[in-house]
Amino acid sequence: MMMTKQKNSLAERLNIGEEARELKLGATFNPKNTSTAFHTIKYDFKPASVDTSRMASVDVGSNNQVTVTVPNSESSGVPHTVYKGNQREYAKECLMIYDKETGAITIEKLNHNIQVKKTRNEVSNKSVQLPGQNMGQGQPHNQGANGAGPAPTSVPGQGSGTAPKMENSTMRISTKTKVSTGSRRNNIIDFKPRNSPMQQNSPSRPVPVHRSPQSAPAWDANNAQQTLPSIPLITDDDDFGLRAALHNSGHANRSGSAAGQPDFVSTSSSTHIGKQRQAPPHGHGKRQQMHQRLSPPMAQQQQQHPSNYGRGYNGGHNHAQQQQQQQRNSPPRQRPSAYGHDNTMDVDSSREHELTSQSVAQAAAALEQQIGGVLSASSSSSESDSSDSDSGSDSDDSTEDDRSTQGQQQDHQQQPHQVYQNHNHTQQQVTQQHHNQLPNLGLGSISPAYGSNHQQQHQQQMLQHQQKQKQQSGIYASNGGFPNDFLQNDLQLSSNSSDDDDD
């Protein structure tokens, strides 16, 4: 049935009748045949410009590469069309040949199956792009073939003349690929973020400086001392610091002496320890000059101008007077000393006070004896002169002489009294300055050898001497003469003597 259908279809197509015909085997079935072969060629595209009147050429190269050249018509402008492809052998395929003249049908074996494609620029570009895309590069490659000649690269196994062109084009593409890859890497390195570790570790780039908010302000902890006044720290071995500080304290000494302070205060050994803050004085808000007594064992006693951490100090006459008033009116307070050397100064001051008190007591006793002798002499002279007629005038003269003598004695008495008062006033100021010092010292202060009881006894002795001196000075009149009681007694004696003369 199938043969009938095939014959029917074949008979219809070849216009052969339904009669039976003889089938012959061709020369290809003969094993000794070497001259006859049948091949099939399959084209992908057949242009209309192909000239069928002329013969085409088939070139079989190595590795089963086949090039087919088909001539074109002269009117097309292109001499021929080139096809390239490959071939493979047939195994069981046959070819039936029908001869219209004789009506004989011959069967022949097929040898090779050839499949070719037209060599176009587009096709060649696609064939070249495939290896380029595998390499990561898609740049187009221009072929040298334009249809008039064979294209250099499209089908493997082509002629030896076109093979070097394929290799050269491939090498050019690989070179361009390497250059583009390097440029991309350079761009990636150039556009890295600022915080990238590769950029920070790169030797070619400068190391970025990270500014924190703590270092942004202009105020710096290290530079903060530059705005403060220079406050030298004085120790036991720092003799040069004391000498340098003496120049800064010259103005304070002159202002203190101009305000009426004794010279002993201006030349006393007092220095201010650095890093000491000033406490507010009694709530009145005025700045008060603070001194601290210091006696290093190997350094001379000098005075240093105090500085209060950047506050301006304007030492004038009015300020010195206010300073003295505050020191006089402030209650005495016991302050620890900054060094242990104050014991020597306190003992020296107590010895000086004892010697002064003894000298004053001796002067007072001698003065009392002189006063007693003068009084007894005046009374005896007044009694002896009462019998004379001129006793009144003589007594008046003697009284005046006695007054002048007594005035001289009073002057002699007032001189040690003034010396004692000056010394006492100096001791009070030194003691007051010692008490008005700040308690919070950063140099390891120790308490003095004498206690509060010794200070109280010292103050009581000073008060007793002052009271005695006031009593002794109160005996005399304000004009330096004898008191009113002695004058009245003298007048009574003179009047009695005059009455006796009249009788």
From Swiss-Prot:
Sequence segments annotated as region (Disordered): 119-220, 250-360, 372-503
Any Gene Ontology CC annotation: super elongation complex
Subcellular location: Nucleus
Biological process annotations from GO: cellular response to heat; positive regulation of DNA-templated transcription; transcription elongation by RNA polymerase II
Segments of skewed composition (Polar residues): 119-145, 167-186, 250-273, 298-307
Pfam families hit by this protein: EAF
Biased composition (Low complexity): 202-215, 308-337, 406-437, 454-472, 487-497
Record family assignment: Belongs to the EAF family.
Name of the protein this chain belongs to: Ell-associated factor Eaf
Gene that encodes it: Eaf
